[in-house]
Amino acid sequence: MEIYSPVVPAVKDVKRLDEIRKSAKFHPSIWGDFFLSYNSDNTQISEAEEEEVAKQKEAVRELLAQVPEGSTYKMELIDLIQRLGVNYHFEKEIHDSLNYIHENSQHNDDEVRTTALRFRLLRQQGYRVPCDVFRKFTDGEGNFATALTNDVEGLLELYEASHLATRGEEILDRAMEFSSSHLQALLNQHLVGSVSLSKRVDEALKMPIRKTLTRLGARKFISLYQEDESRNELLLNFAKLDFNMVQKMHQRELSDATRWWKKLEVAKRMPYARDRVVECFFWIVGVYFEPCYATARRILSKAINMASIVDDTYEYATLDELQILTDAIQRWDVNETLEDSPPHVQMCYKALIQAYAEIEDEVVENFGGEELYRVQYAIEHVKQSAVAFFEEAKWIYNNSIPTVEEYMKVAFVTCGYMMLSTTSLVGVGSDRVSKADFDWIVNEPLIVRASCVICRLMDDLVGDEYEEKPSSVLCYMKQYVVSKDEARARLEQQVKDAWKDMNEECIEPRPASMQILTRVLNLGRVIHLLYREGDSYTDPNRSKEWVKMVFVDPI
């Protein structure tokens, strides 16, 4: 997150503060009460729909079973199921098939497309497949053969596979440079081939599979796949039915979230804060969209909305007011009202305490009182965030620019991804997470640190024009005496390296289950989408079409 807000906090001049507060207005919500219209009546899933989905699901399962293990068609089928967003129905079947491929494949294919597809599928599953399988497609100097440029499908698979690289895998770095440059050239010259393939290449160059949000990616791929003349009608129809059924569930959840948000009266009581309940829910569906994570979505949605309010309050309040708020959050006294504090401080604290009380109720109701320890892990992150936000406010108050190391230590906390990574586990079933998982994730493992790097730096790279607030760009420029362009280039490389660290953590032996690691990976995917070409959180018009595709328009 940081859910970066370009408002100047903690200024010394009270008169200037008043002027800033009057002008510190974000774009209002573009959705308003739109999602309140979705209720149990118009989002009801009929018995006939459920029966049809179940019927087609079994037909797809039979298709998977009929295709010979280890065959190219089996890999293509698994890839289609994953990209259509219905792989969560067939996790065991896919695991068994890919395990067979991993144990029995000789990697002796002559086609780059097959080699790259196998490599990507296995790496996505967490298998440590050597990148040397691509050397057969290079010359003595390690350059990829120019003949590969005649195979668009092969180039596309090579490009997608290259995004599964870890640090030190230079051949995959060269594969990415080679494939992306040639695909772009072919696209520019209209030499890709069919319209359907051209659209796939264009989408891949914008958003490779590894960085794609599963739900949004599935919505887009379904539209592309139905234009494919070789499409499998069974798979396509099942994907459409499943997407629409899950969309109805999300619509009900978003209606509930909107109703909860309205009760907070944020627009009235905290008008300086961004009204982004819909965008926050989109963020969380990016972390987990599957029906089994409904409780987790409710909890994480409340947490991210509270993080946004707290962030905006620390951007808005004076330093003295922030001292009061920070101290109160450290005490975390549910009976404290801060009645002698300004209204916005009182409301921020009250909303925060109330939200986490509701989260505790959710945990008790769904998992039992013995699981309440989960919420304490989440609250501890909120406390750490308050201290870090206050540290940032003091930098601005004192007109100081910290070193890159000082900045990143604080910004890792204020970006919100440590908090979201931990809180993403709070609403997950006891069969999927344990106390040991919480102990692991709060100790800042590499994958969480990498997600923080991606979040913090991508946020800064689109928001560095706001020079009132120290950013990694400004800190880097000052410390290393380089131009803004040079600073940005080096920070962009750090983002690329962070993705490689994320990939490494997902390969066996893994530090946690793939289900847990995927939550953190998905957080990285969300930030890549939202901040790739601008701040699509603060400016809701940037994310409007994505929201419509996922929550409004059925297929």
From Swiss-Prot:
Expressed in peltate glandular trichomes. Present at low levels in flowers, leaves and stems. Its cofactor is Mn(2+); Mg(2+). One of its GO terms (molecular function) is protein homodimerization activity. It catalyses: (2E,6E)-farnesyl diphosphate = bicyclogermacrene + diphosphate; (2E)-geranyl diphosphate = terpinolene + diphosphate; (2E)-geranyl diphosphate = (4R)-limonene + diphosphate; (2E)-geranyl diphosphate + H2O = (2E)-geraniol + diphosphate. The keyword Magnesium applies. Keywords: Hydrolase, Lyase, Magnesium, Manganese, Metal-binding. GO terms for biological process: diterpenoid biosynthetic process. InterPro entries: Isoprenoid_synthase_dom_sf, Terpene_cyclase-like_1_C, Terpene_cyclase_plant_C1, Terpene_synth_N, Terpene_synth_N_sf, Terpene_synthase-like, Terpene_synthase_metal-bd, Terpenoid_cyclase/PrenylTrfase. Residues 316-322, 392-429 are annotated as: Homodimerization. Pfam families: Terpene_synth (PF01397), Terpene_synth_C (PF03936). The keyword Hydrolase applies. Its EC number is 4.2.3.100, 4.2.3.-, 3.1.7.11, 4.2.3.20. A motif (DDXXD motif) lies at residues 311-315. Mg(2+) 1 binds at D311, E315. Binds 3 Mg(2+) or Mn(2+) ions per subunit. It comes from the Eukaryota. The Asp-Asp-Xaa-Xaa-Asp/Glu (DDXXD/E) motif is important for the catalytic activity, presumably through binding to Mg(2+). This is Bicyclo-germacrene synthase. It comes from Origanum vulgare (Wild marjoram).
